[in-house]
């Protein structure tokens, strides 16, 4: 566990993916503003810190949402109250996220339960990347329905995409599921399609870093290909998200800023050697180049539905407006 004591440490933690997952990035950014206020309550310093936080990762909308909410709250108060109010607002943001994720699980449970009642056998769920309690304040988004189903006694098994290049599925989602004693199997990223063809996937549930008001979904690279495979094989493809992940301003997926990360994340892998020491090794020829796009966009037409804290809706402007406007 790493303690963050300054706003600069918060920015670096987000940028270096020491914290990751859209809701958790938002919570970290909120407390980053608290740390900025604690360091120097000069409005100019706080504004510059807010800008740097927003710029630390461009794709996940929760980051900007949380910083904007914090700055709006601080603009309404006197300087002698600023630290207490900032701390209270950051806590409210995190408490809300936990409750939202719990509600996502309650609503998503209905879908899993319906599949189980028809199948009368283990429900096989495919997920991508990590959208669990390691990516949120608690419960997770995509994993929350799974945890609720497991707690209710519904037998579930999860296909866990390894999610190259950082292997968040293999390293984080599988770890979470093991801790919750939920059966899971790690698969290579390109395995999902054949599993769907074989009828071994009942439902896909993924998270999202930014969902547009028209239902387009921006998530970890590889999500789009899973949605295409699911569509071709008539497998339901759901996206789980809190309302803080909705971008009401950008109207087309092509306009979402897609983060390009260091190519070394792709060309090198980290792991434990036989002595349990962490090692990083190059897996490509020295002269080869690599491009590391962190996210892709899944058009709304491939999304069966959005699982939110207020219920389930179709991935469309009309569906989202019915719940949130």
Model feature map: region roles:
Residues 9-14, 47-50, 285-287:
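Short hydrophobic "helix-edge" motifs at membrane interfaces and signal-peptide entry regions
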Residues 7, 63, 230-231:
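Short N-terminal signal/transit or membrane-insertion segments
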Residues 1-20:
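Generic N-terminal targeting/processing segments that precede catalytic cores or assembly contacts
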Residues 3-6, 132-136, 213-218:
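Short, glycine-rich nucleotide/cofactor-binding loops
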């Amino acid at each position: 566990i790493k303690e963050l004591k300054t706003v600069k440490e918060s920015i670096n933690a987000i940028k270096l993916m020491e914290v990751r997952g859209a809701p958790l990035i938002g919570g970290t950014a909120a407390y980053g503003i608290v740390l900025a206020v604690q360091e120097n309550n000069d409005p100019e310093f706080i504004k510059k810190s807010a800008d740097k936080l927003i710029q630390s990762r461009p794709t996940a909308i929760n980051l900007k949402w949380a910083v904007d909410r914090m700055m709006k709250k601080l603009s309404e108060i006197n300087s002698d109250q600023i630290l207490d109010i900032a701390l209270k607002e950051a806590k409210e943001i995190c408490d809300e996220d936990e409750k939202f994720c719990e509600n996502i699980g309650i609503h998503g449970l209905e879908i899993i339960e319906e599949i189980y009642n028809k199948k009368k056998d283990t429900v096989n769920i495919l997920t991508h990347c990590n959208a669990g309690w390691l990516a949120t304040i608690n419960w997770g988004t995509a994993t929350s329905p799974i945890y609720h189903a497991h707690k209710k006694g519904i037998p579930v098994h999860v296909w866990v995409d390894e999610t190259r290049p950082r292997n968040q599925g293999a390293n984080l989602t599988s770890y979470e599921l093991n801790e919750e004693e939920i059966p899971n199997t790690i698969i290579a990223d390109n395995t999902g399609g054949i599993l769907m063809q074989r009828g071994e996937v009942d439902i896909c549930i993924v998270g999202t870093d930014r969902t547009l008001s028209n239902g387009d979904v921006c998530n970890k690279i590889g999500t789009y290909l899973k949605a295409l495979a699911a569509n071709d094989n008539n497998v339901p493809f759901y996206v789980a998200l809190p309302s803080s992940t909705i971008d009401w301003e950008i109207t087309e997926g092509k306009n979402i800023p897609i983060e390009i990360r260091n190519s070394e994340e792709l060309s090198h892998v980290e792991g434990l050697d036989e002595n349990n020491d962490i090692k990083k090794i190059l897996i490509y020829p020295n002269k080869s180049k690599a491009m590391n796009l962190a996210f892709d966009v899944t058009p709304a037409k491939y999304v069966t539905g959005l699982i939110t804290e207020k219920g389930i809706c179709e991935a469309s402007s009309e569906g989202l407006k019915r719940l949130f406007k």
